[in-house]
Amino acid sequence: MINPISFRPGPVTFWTTLVYLALLIPIVIINETVPPAPAAADDGKIEGVNLTEAWLDLTRITRGYHPYNSRFNEEVRGYLLGRVGEILEGSGVGGKKGNVTVFDDLRSNVTGLMAGSVVPTPGSAQVAAYFEGTNILVYVRGKGDDEGDWWRRSAEGGEMEGVRKNERGLVLVNAHYDSVSTGYGATDDGMGVVTCLQVIKYFAHPDHQPERGIVVMLNNGEEDYLYGARALGQHPLNPYIHTFLNLEGAGAGGRANLFRTTDREVTAAYAGTSDPFGTVIASDAFGLGFIRSGTDYSVLYDVYGQRGLDLAFFKPRSRYHTNRDDATHTSKASLWHMLSAAIHTASKLSGDTGDTFVGARPDGARNKVRNGSPSNGVWFDLFGKGFVNFGLRGMFAWSLTVLVATPLILVLATYILHKLDKYYFFTSSVRTYDQPDFEPVLVGGWKGAFRFPFAFIVSGALSLAVAFLMRKVNPFIIYSHRYSVIAMIFSLFYFTFWSIMRGANFARPSALHRGYVNIWLFILGWATLVAVTVTEDRFKLGAGYPIVFLQTAVCLTTFLTLCELFALPKKTAWGQQVREDHEVHDYYQPQSGNNNTRTESPPPLPQIPHQPSLVPPATRDSNASTLRQGDGNDTDDEDAAVPTERTPLVGGGNATSEHFRTTFATTYRRSITALVNGARKYGQDGDEPFEHEQAWSGRLPSWLWFFQFLILGPFTIILAAQTGLMLVDAVHQTGADGSNLLLPYLIVFAFTVLVLLPITPVIHRISHHIPVFLLVVFVGTLIYNLVAFPFSEESRYKVYFVQQIDLDTADNRVCYNGVDEYVHKIIAELPSASGRNVTCGESKRAELVSCCYDGVDVAPRLGSETPEEDTPIEEIYKSLATVTATRGEGNKAQLEIEADNTKACFLEFKQPISGFNVQGGSEWDDRFGQFPEGGIKQLKLWHRQRGERWVVDVEWKDAEKLEGQVVCAWSDANEAGTIPALDEGLRYSPVWAAITKFAEGLVEGRKGFSV
């Protein structure tokens, strides 16, 4: 019976294929599905939380586009205030009664530098903004919080009314209720908003009062540049917020991903959720800029110093900021995934009554909250059910241990094997005697030594070549066919690696093949771990944890590789046995020719004993010379008798028998029975070498490979596969944003290599069936990926829309920004562009082009009142915005801006201004950056109410006069006909195209000024 785990093609093929399928299939399913929401009958799975109610709220607030600069945004705000009141009334509290206080914040204004404008070039002009907030905050008093309105400041001196006794800090749960002007905001961020409503409902219930106070904030203006979170900085509760949970949506459904956390301690609050999902690799990718997306997390952590988590939907990105970010294209399951995680995490953060989030900051920043000393963490989920969270310092210590200790252990094992004469690696032959006249015995220990690096380089090079080919020929194919790309690169690497390793082993079979691969994996992993350890220490990155686990496993498998050599005989003993077998063979071999012939430099003996030749046939011609033996004075070789069938097998004491000695001229002699038995021991059951491998390899354990594969394979496959899929999902559709088109392919390649590394030591034993099948897969997917159209109705290409109007001349242009090839295809389908001259140039978005045409046929209707039919278009546009510039003393001026039916106007200056003041606004907030030495080149102005006037005092240096433009933005496209160009684009663009906003305004109206 064949050993089911023997190192033979059948068992190796079966077990490796089974393990890969058993792990990869569930990982793909988990990646593509969402844990089911509780049934309607079990809607109260979490006491006090109602999923049906939350879903109904979602459908209400996503009936229209609701950017900050829209009328429906105001309706959404009113609806949310009403829902908060209903929830509190249902919980037995209302307004400021009891343990809950509602803040309808219409007072917080913020003036400061735009974070994205901060550049390292000294003296460069930058961008500033003035914003008026409309946030809604609900404070749920904790059991340990002070009584009364402890947050109020006295009118005199700005000091607290009293010293707050509880220093444990508050927990913030945050979401934004505005959407982009081209998306309904179901996922971004409607689900976060309705989750916040349920969080209020849960903690407002008397039975669920939190230990530490919880602040639920529904902020407004996030989409235009995180303005709502900036306005929080002016609220009296903000200094007491120590931790936060930010709820976001950078996709349109799926699972809510733990995208970022500030430290290990806050991550622990999330760890116990029923369906965790996320990895620290995504967090580090954000920090390094590989994933472009800004959320309120940036303000809460970077500016205010709060510690917290970013829980966000992240796919599919093709629906993000489009009209398919609606309730139809998401699910209750996705909502429940975020809602259940938010309730759990907020409860854990609030329930920490120790000193975890209290105390001095390690950076000593005085303008940030004192919330203790965080520690960097490493975290990831397992199959969407388990969650691992440990300290980065611990991983750093373990990395150092692996780097230092494991080479020493392997060196020690190698030394012991060498002393025992059992180290077969890197040994070509062995000498059994010290005399130079005796030729060495071949061991074959170098066979297979350099196969792995050659196969790895060739397979990797071919896989990378295919990735670059895709980038060159059809770069967006991964946009909608990522699994086709994954299958292509996976199958190519597998087949190429197998072909080289199997071919090399066929040409020169080696029992050390698996061992050499483990040694190479150790060397490669050790070098990689050095780099990972440096990033852990210097840059505080935990993304290298798969390498740490992989190298730990490789160290163990390499150690086992050395340990199995202990089962082998000593090299010299084995060599002597081979020599003896050859002695018997040559002793009985019939000989002819000159018996004095002797080779000057005898070749090494072959390693395989001539067992069938121990008893020679009766008739056989041979060119072997006759042998002689003597004491140096006996040279009578010619008298030596040729043995025949009558010659005794065992020599006697007579003189004649003394002539029958071996070719090795040794005085060592054994009985023929001992020689035969010694030779036969290599042919006993279980000791036979596999096929044509080295004869001594028959004693190697045939089952050890199985346990080595279990050590190296499953955990590495799990980490690499689920992390790779998550990262590919995060970036494979970012090419439309102008991101690097090669990056998704490189991620696929890198994690393909990681997934397949565990099989490399045994891949040469796999039968041809799997590799040939994968070759067919590669050919099919390669052809498909080269010729298929990259977009589909389910994965639409996003193009960026803006309409620009000169309010003085009434000239207007419709512009689409994107990749040149596809922008032209989209514009070609638009009736208003037919026959028009389309001009293209560089876009403000990197790596994209801007293609524009005359929009006279699709002129927007932006005013709050409908003009008379015979009113000239020039007069209509001139009345949309006015700017009055009044010169003051020196280089000072006052600008008065009024705009109809909008809340946003921006001032652009030809020469930077050195100072400004918005009358009725707030002072400059240094937390967002010092006033730049190079001045301000653009000032963005936002009002709470549409149609209000801005009065801005400015001053400048050097120039005699100040020139610039006022750019007002209109973003409300809910009423058909308001922006006909957008309506036309949504109606007539190809089914594979989606339209999203280019900037804050769908329409930008410009008017110049000079003073």
Swiss-Prot record:
Which EC numbers does the record give?
3.4.-.-
So which stretches are on the Vacuolar side?
31-395, 471-483, 536-546, 721-742, 791-1011
Q: Give the matching Pfam families.
A: Peptidase_M28, PFF1_C, PFF1_TM
Topological domain ranges for the Cytoplasmic compartment: 1-9, 417-449, 505-514, 568-699, 764-769
Topology with regard to the membrane? Multi-pass membrane protein
Report whether Cell membrane shows up as a keyword of the record. no
Q: Give the residue spans that cross the bilayer.
A: 10-30, 396-416, 450-470, 484-504, 515-535, 547-567, 700-720, 743-763, 770-790
Q: Where is the active site?
A: 222
Q: What spans are recorded as compositionally biased (Polar residues)?
A: 589-600
Q: Where in the cell is it found?
A: Vacuole membrane
What molecular function terms (GO) are annotated for this protein?
Answer: metal ion binding; metalloexopeptidase activity
Give me the residues that bind Zn(2+) 2, please.
188, 223, 321
Give the cofactor note: Binds 2 Zn(2+) ions per subunit.
Q: Which GO terms describe its cellular component?
A: vacuolar membrane
Keyword check for Aminoacyl-tRNA synthetase: no
Annotated glycan sites = 31, 50, 99, 109, 837
Q: Which UniProt keywords apply?
A: Glycoprotein, Hydrolase, Membrane, Metal-binding, Metalloprotease, Protease, Transmembrane, Transmembrane helix, Vacuole, Zinc
What is the protein's known function? May be involved in vacuolar sorting and osmoregulation.
**Protein name (Swiss-Prot/TrEMBL):** Vacuolar membrane protease
